[in-house]
Amino acid sequence: QCEPYLTTDYVYGAEQCEYAFLAIPYLLKASGAKRVFFCTKKDKPALIDACEKWRKKYSSLPVELVLAKDAYPRGYERNLVTLVTGKEYEHIPIEAGCIVDNIYTYIALGRYFTQGKSADRRCVTVSGEVAKPMNILAPYGVLAEDVLSLAGFKAEDDLKIVNGGPRNGNVLSDGHYVLLQQADG
């Protein structure tokens, strides 16, 4: 996760990490890949502990955990490919022999492959000048204002609503924005 104020990947990843591991056999078969690298920042102990726990349980899977120093924008896929392989590429990661996915994608696929459940919700970070900053697991289609209200946001507070983070986010005119799969904070 390259956005500095979003924590959805770390929180949801730590809580649902086993599903990511359950997706790996399917993804290895579909992609022809020989191994998987889980990369996270060194300052995310809950996610690191979860990855180590499930890596031990599923020790037959070719998974390596790569810990990166906290450097913005560490989640940027070019940085990850270079960190893990030492290679660079011009257009897309496959040029360096890599497929880069977010842990959220692995979790969603793990839930689908093992339980037949499609991705129908998204964990979003609500932070900034709200009364109760938090991560919220919300169904797709809910209005942003409903999610924001859980964190104590009030329209009259005259705060900016940013969909995403400062790097890739966009300012919304109001909370009448429908939560979609791409939203994460």
Q: What are these model-predicted stretches?
A:
Residues 1-9, 130:
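Gly-rich Lys/Arg/Thr-decorated short loops/hinges at beta-loop-alpha junctions or inter-strand turns
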Residues 9-14, 36-39:
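Metallocofactor- and cofactor-centric catalytic cores in central/energy metabolism, strongly enriched
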